[in-house]
Amino acid sequence: MVRISTSISYLWGMVASLFLMMPAYSADAPVSSPPAPIEARNSVFTAQHPDQFNSWKATSEQSERHDALAEDPYMVILWAGYPFSRDYNKPRGHAYAITDVRETLRTGAPKTAEDGPLPMACWSCKSPDVARLIQQEGEDGYFKGKWARGGPEITNDLGCADCHDTASPDFAQGKPALTLSRPYAERAMEAIGKPFDQASRFGQQSMVCGQCHVEYYFSGKDKAVKFPWDNGTKVEDMEKYYDAISFSDWTNTLSRAPMLKAQHPEYETWSVGIHGKNNVTCIDCHMPKVKNADGKLYTDHKIGNPFDNYGETCTNCHTQDKAAMQAVVAERKTAIHELKLKAEEQLVHAHFEAKAAWDAGATEAEMQPILMDIRHAQWRWDLAVASHGIHMHAPDEGLRMLGTSLSKSAEARTKLVRLLAQKGVTGEVKLPDISTKEKAQQAIGLNMQQIKAEKQDFLNTVVPQWDEQARKAGRLN
């Protein structure tokens, strides 16, 4: 009995000691608060950062549209069966991000939020409303559904909250407060050993641009954005990744090859170029420090050609005059362009010759190695040309990729010659007239009159409804 009483007394003593050791909490103790809601309306920050806002707004001056398919009809054939064969304009100012994604024929003409050919993910590089929706709905929630679901929600052009933590004290005090507003971009940077929060100021500057100016694909049932960087960021690394998971963006309707469509891999190509290797960032060349009317320095947000601000960009490193530097860049651009056209010509022939082989009775087993050669050849071509500034960012890498594209196309065409001969086709496979965009689109069976009419009806009826819903909800600038 004495032993039991002693044990009970000992246990109560231990409980009392543990209780006294526990931290005291009160109603006044601080608790973690949820993050401030992301403000997607760029105009809200006009008074806070007037020079930056006004220079960002000036991207509306970059309004000219360049029809890439009209300039190069071969691309219609290379993208047969994919929306890019309908419409592909070269990029213009950030102020047109929403307008252009609404108006492109690639996004179709949906009538309802559940209609249309493309997923929600197609908004992901267009607006700070994307970051707002991810914060509100979670990443999984944001990616669910069709592109049209985001129409009334995503209405503000690419701007402040895409790159800056606009709710932070640092931003309020005039500091950059750079951030990765897309969680999938943060994961991708970590996958290549570049955690954002451990990066230098220069590294972070390029990473915020690299949220969008990258290669990516839509993964899984909900078509979530993912960067294919698990093996690295070179063309062969990403190809290996895609092949391992048997991913293809679409099947070319002529050759039936399972194709990959490169997006805009500026981060990857810049990284292997002379500027990337020397920590010369996107900001240094495209968003230099300039002075306002009062002589105060600020970062110019009218993102554009470095030659437009030569004294504030190139001369920080180069001693040559502007004309000399422009001549060097023009020479590199010409070299890239000439090899690009050669690669395209071989690929176009390969697609039509593959079609001829199918028509002659070729089997899937016979065609499989040929189609993989076509896939790999076009992937290299596309990654080079989709990076619009590769002649400046990494000309050697651009020439290398295009050169290997030619080699892969040659392998495909050599195999096709042999296979066609086995099937009794010994003459040259003639190409249809694809000398213009319109003729090339006709050759792959596109009814452009109907596609354009449906799009115009969408712009006249659905888009005004989106804007009205956004206006009533207070989401518009």
UniProtKB/Swiss-Prot annotation:
Question: Which cofactors must be present for this protein to function?
Answer: Ca(2+); heme c
User: GO molecular function, one example?
Assistant: iron ion binding
What does the entry list as the binding residues for heme?
122, 125-126
Q: Which GO terms describe its cellular component?
A: outer membrane-bounded periplasmic space
Which Pfam families is this protein grouped with? Cytochrom_C552 (PF02335)
**Pathway in which this enzyme or protein is active:** Nitrogen metabolism; nitrate reduction (assimilation)
Keyword check for Transport: yes
Q: Which residues does the record give as heme c 5 binding sites?
A: 275, 314, 317-318
Q: Name one GO biological process term.
A: anaerobic electron transport chain
What UniProt keywords apply to this chain's record, in alphabetical order? Calcium, Electron transport, Heme, Iron, Metal-binding, Oxidoreductase, Periplasm, Signal, Transport
Per UniProt, where does Ca(2+) bind? 215-216, 261, 263
The residues that hold heme c 2 are 160, 163-164, 301
Instruction: Explain the purpose of this protein.
Output: Catalyzes the reduction of nitrite to ammonia, consuming six electrons in the process.
User: What's the name of the protein?
Assistant: Cytochrome c-552
Instruction: Please report the organism this UniProt entry assigns to the protein.
Output: Pectobacterium carotovorum subsp. carotovorum (strain PC1)
Upper classification of the source organism reads:
Bacteria, Pseudomonadati, Pseudomonadota, Gammaproteobacteria, Enterobacterales
